[in-house]
UniProtKB/Swiss-Prot annotation:
Protein name per its UniProtKB record: Glycine--tRNA ligase alpha subunit
Example of a GO biological process term: glycyl-tRNA aminoacylation
MF terms (GO), sorted A to Z: ATP binding; glycine-tRNA ligase activity
One annotated Gene Ontology cellular component of this protein: cytosol
Listed Pfam families: tRNA-synt_2e
Lineage, uppermost ranks: Bacteria, Pseudomonadati, Pseudomonadota, Alphaproteobacteria, Hyphomicrobiales
Broadest EC class assigned to this enzyme: ligase
Family (UniProt): Belongs to the class-II aminoacyl-tRNA synthetase family.
Protein's cellular compartments: Cytoplasm
């Protein structure tokens, strides 16, 4: 399949490229997240000493960015391609440029520039040194060296690559409207466009996000998710006796943190959160994320070494 001819071929080419580099090619996380970084394969696995390599597509929702399907390149639901490499390889930029070449953007034929743009996620308590990648004057991706996630220092530092798939596909296909993207690589009656797949949903979710979402219910959902996250962290915490040295319930707790974050984004889109309240909500989600990150470090995947502790 030609990555210049279809959206799905672009994704499959990136899958193949990063699989060849040793990454586990994962599936999208089955929850509403604002960015690929929220996937536990990045947020949690960036913590602790254990090496980790993964790549995946993540549907991402940013309710405030909806434009009722009338904007050619701004969406409330879109796709990111995420790569996480821990420890950060010394040739991360070279690997990234190789991925561009694989999808048809030869760095020798295009003006590829890296513009310094440090990254931060206030709700995740995460930040890193980073650069935007511009191709012939258009931003197509970002790469970041994680310094902190969940308010916890990353040791070793992890390298993260984030591709904006729609924007990248628009560039390689040479179209100006995201809904005109060829999705399946066929022509004529067999052609399926991005608009055929997503335009109606984009219109309807814009109405939901800005007009119809029940704000009283959303407020309750936020509080419920916050309480459940804390309750699960408490329930799974290591016991004082030697029979339970590991945390037993990190991922379910982190799911509740993700839910709280998405509900906050919906409330923000509905315009019912003041500037002061907004900072309070961000702090509450960040507090949950930090607690989940700390709990993850008490698991085998987080790198806790029980043999050394017992010695």
């Amino acid at each position: 399949m030609n990555p210049k001819r279809s959206f799905q071929a672009l994704i499959l080419t990136l899958h193949s490229y990063w699989a060849d580099k040793g990454c586990a090619v994962l599936q999208p996380y089955d929850m509403e997240v604002g960015a690929g970084t929220f996937h536990p394969a990045t947020t949690l696995r960036a913590l602790g000493p254990k090496p980790w390599k993964a790549a995946y597509v993540q549907p991402s929702r940013r309710p405030s960015d909806g434009r009722y399907g009338e904007n050619p390149n701004r969406l409330q639901h879109y796709y990111q391609y995420q790569v996480i490499l821990k420890p950060n390889p010394p040739n991360l930029q070279e690997l990234y440029l190789g991925s561009l070449a694989a999808i048809g953007l030869d760095p020798l034929l295009h003006d590829i520039r890296f513009v310094e743009d440090d990254w931060e996620s206030p709700t995740l308590g995460a930040w890193g040194l980073g650069w935007e990648c511009w191709c012939d004057g258009m931003e197509v991706s970002q790469f970041t060296y994680f310094q902190q996630v969940c308010g916890i220092e990353c040791a070793p530092v992890a390298g993260e690559l984030t591709y904006g798939l729609e924007r990248l596909a628009m560039y390689v296909q040479g179209v100006d409207n995201v809904y005109d993207l060829n999705f399946n690589g066929r022509e004529g009656d067999e052609k399926i466009s991005y608009g055929d797949v997503f335009l109606q949903a984009e219109q309807e979710y814009s109405r939901h996000n800005f007009e119809f979402a029940n704000t009283e219910m959303l407020h309750r959902h936020f509080v419920d998710a916050e309480k459940e996250c804390r309750a699960l962290l408490d329930a799974g915490a290591p016991a004082d006796n030697a029979n339970q040295r590991l945390h037993k319930c990190v991922f379910p707790a982190y799911d509740q943190c993700i839910k709280a974050s998405h509900v906050f984004n919906l409330l923000d889109a509905r315009g019912v959160i003041s500037v002061t309240e907004r900072q309070s909500y961000i702090l509450r989600v960040r507090t949950l994320a930090k607690a989940c990150g700390e709990a993850f470090l008490l698991t085998d995947a987080g790198g806790v070494n029980l043999s050394k502790e017992a010695a």
